Amino acid sequence: MNCVCRLVLVVLSLWPDTAVAPGPPPGPPRVSPDPRAELDSTVLLTRSLLADTRQLAAQLRDKFPADGDHNLDSLPTLAMSAGALGALQLPGVLTRLRADLLSYLRHVQWLRRAGGSSLKTLEPELGTLQARLDRLLRRLQLLMSRLALPQPPPDPPAPPLAPPSSAWGGIRAAHAILGGLHLTLDWAVRGLLLLKTRL
């Protein structure tokens, strides 16, 4: 029996084409995703996060009314005025938007940790906001990769944010963070829609 097996192997080795099963036929080359569709998806996520931020800011105002402007020196300044939208270029917009949103993500995480007991009632909404910010950041990273844009250098470690000096300080910080994030996302939607027309 052993000899028969060896004989079969020898015979098969004489005709290698019959011994090796052919592989699957080569398919059509993979089509890279349309960057306009990727940009559409990013705009939808940004609009959704803008609506969430607007709603959470309204809840905060209802629970803790606070007149006037609220600022945090550690927050990024608004990337661009609405009047300067015409001069935008895609690489700069995506890089700046990613950097600003990373800063806001860090501030939302800080607010959840150090905002004080008054803000605990908004914890579920702040958690959802943090998760959606993270999702949008991943989408921006994917979009930059699909467009073959140069990857930004790693961000240097940011200094830790000091805890609010009082419960009221935490509330004012929340107003500043949500207000700034709202303006940034509104600017981002306008800028991304304009840039889509140039792709």
From Swiss-Prot:
One of its GO terms (biological process) is B cell differentiation. The record marks 168 as: Important for interaction with IL6ST and for the stimulation of cell proliferation. Residues 182-190 are annotated as: Important for interaction with IL11RA and for the stimulation of cell proliferation. Changing residue 186 to A: Strongly increases affinity for IL11RA and stimulation of cell proliferation. GO terms for cellular component: cytoplasm; extracellular region; extracellular space. GO terms for molecular function: cytokine activity; growth factor activity; interleukin-11 receptor binding. It is found in: Secreted. Changing residue 186 to V: Increases affinity for IL11RA and stimulation of cell proliferation. It comes from the Eukaryota. Its main location: secreted. Residues 1-21 form the signal peptide. Keywords: Cytokine, Growth factor, Pharmaceutical, Secreted, Signal. SUPFAM superfamilies: 4-helical cytokines. Disulfide bonds: none annotated. Belongs to the IL-6 superfamily. Interacts with IL11RA to associate with IL6ST, giving rise to a multimeric signaling complex. Cytokine that stimulates the proliferation of hematopoietic stem cells and megakaryocyte progenitor cells and induces megakaryocyte maturation resulting in increased platelet production. Also promotes the proliferation of hepatocytes in response to liver damage. Binding to its receptor formed by IL6ST and IL11RA activates a signaling cascade that promotes cell proliferation. Signaling leads to the activation of intracellular protein kinases and the phosphorylation of STAT3. PANTHER family: INTERLEUKIN 11, INTERLEUKIN-11. This is Interleukin-11. It comes from Homo sapiens (Human). The gene is IL11.
